[in-house]
Amino acid sequence: MSDILQELLRVSEKAANIARACRQQETLFQLLIEEKKEGEKNKKFAVDFKTLADVLVQEVIKENMENKFPGLGKKIFGEESNEFTNDLGEKIIMRLGPTEEETVALLSKVLNGNKLASEALAKVVHQDVFFSDPALDSVEINIPQDILGIWVDPIDSTYQYIKGSADITPNQGIFPSGLQCVTVLIGVYDIQTGVPLMGVINQPFVSQDLHTRRWKGQCYWGLSYLGTNIHSLLPPVSTRSNSEAQSQGTQNPSSEGSCRFSVVISTSEKETIKGALSHVCGERIFRAAGAGYKSLCVILGLADIYIFSEDTTFKWDSCAAHAILRAMGGGMVDLKECLERNPDTGLDLPQLVYHVGNEGAAGVDQWANKGGLIAYRSEKQLETFLSRLLQHLAPVATHT
């Protein structure tokens, strides 16, 4: 089944190429911004955007996976609808043509007849991409295709993508904002159990050539199925974090000052959570944009924990990273349920699942992570972190 993961790596790189191509030329990029309709808006942001790049990426992933694995394209779900309305009021369903010329014709309708822009985009969409990881060649795992579902966030952190800041200074390796926070997220889950099985995170904008102004990216993946756990971060990226993790394992977790966790949070995090975190983490609280990027910071060992207490992340935001973290021995859990859970009962941690929507919810809210989330690399670390967090949270905070 590594052939599915290999293909996901390839289409994620094609997606990254589209994201870079759309961002490269400012005049083209301005044409691509479409405001989202009311039912599709993420309520966290006053203004949220749907870009043609978003829709193109999602359709490219669907089309490519369906061509290679018939039937799988119908089980790919994501944030974006594929409907556009152009300046003439025409409703256009975005479907990729089998040829570059047919895609040009459709894109021309979306872009109000702008042939040059349509040709430039169609070329990237139909361009062959050769991208794989030799580490997957030796992997032989048989996962039945009919149990697989796929969540896609074609361009996570759309606001940072549109803003396009390229000169943000990182804080201990973590970018608070900017193009580095943009990710392409593809998560594969078991449609029967909701357990994440495979994840790909492609970061299209990692480093920029100062002469050509062109960007290079990076891709990360993980697979966790029936006891087989492999990922692209062997050996681990951050030796700093490894040594800290080892020291945390040897120190007394009940000793308040013995060690500090590092945590990455959203700038919009609740004051009650931030206040408690200041006791648990001290100065090691980092702010960053994008749910995918914050999860990636945990995967890369730049932070121990990603915590988010609100209900404005969704299945497509978390599935890819969750699968990679599972392959690393970590996971992603429901924050509200964790805070209400009695660790002495021996019950399993409330892992996020991906196959059922929220009862009674409509639109995107049916796929929201309603209880918030915590992403982590080590279960032992998480248990210690939660016990300390609860010591500093007012009782009301666990029920909001």
Curated annotation (Swiss-Prot):
PTM annotation (Phosphoserine): residues: 318
Name the UniProt record assigns to this protein: Inositol polyphosphate 1-phosphatase
Effect caused by changing residue 54 to A: Does not alter affinity for 1D-myo-inositol 1,3,4-trisphosphate. Decreases about 100-fold Li(+) sensitivity. Loss of inositol polyphosphate 1-phosphatase activity
A GO term, aspect molecular function: metal ion binding
GO biological process: phosphatidylinositol phosphate biosynthetic process
Chain residues that bind Mg(2+) 2: 153, 317
Biological function: Mg(2+)-dependent phosphatase that catalyzes the hydrolysis of the 1-position phosphate from inositol 1,4-bisphosphate and inositol 1,3,4-trisphosphate and participates in inositol phosphate metabolism.
UniProt binding sites for 1D-myo-inositol 1,4-bisphosphate: 156-158, 268, 270, 290-291, 294, 312
Recorded metabolic or biological pathway in which this protein acts: Signal transduction; phosphatidylinositol signaling pathway
Keyword Repeat: no
Family: Belongs to the inositol monophosphatase superfamily.
Binding residue positions for Mg(2+) 1: 79, 153, 155
Gene3D superfamilies xrefs: 3.40.190.80, Fructose-1,6-Bisphosphatase, subunit A, domain 1, Inositol Polyphosphate 1-phosphatase, domain 1
Organism: Bos taurus (Bovine)
Required cofactor names: Mg(2+)
Positions of disulphide bridges: none
Entry keywords, A to Z: Hydrolase, Lithium, Magnesium, Metal-binding, Phosphoprotein
Binding site residues for Li(+): 54, 80
Activity regulation, free text: Inhibited by Li(+).
Pfam families per the UniProt record, alphabetical: Inositol_P
Entry's EC annotation: 3.1.3.57
Tree of life domain: Eukaryota
Reaction catalyzed: 1D-myo-inositol 1,4-bisphosphate + H2O = 1D-myo-inositol 4-phosphate + phosphate; 1D-myo-inositol 1,3,4-trisphosphate + H2O = 1D-myo-inositol 3,4-bisphosphate + phosphate
PANTHER family, A to Z: 3'(2'),5'-BISPHOSPHATE NUCLEOTIDASE 1, INOSITOL POLYPHOSPHATE 1-PHOSPHATASE
Keyword Magnesium set for record: yes
InterPro entries according to UniProt: CysQ/Inositol_MonoPase (IPR050725), Inositol_monoP_metal-BS (IPR020583), Inositol_monophosphatase-like (IPR000760), Inositol_monophosphatase_CS (IPR020550), INPP1_dom_1 (IPR044897)
Bias (Polar residues) ranges: 238-257
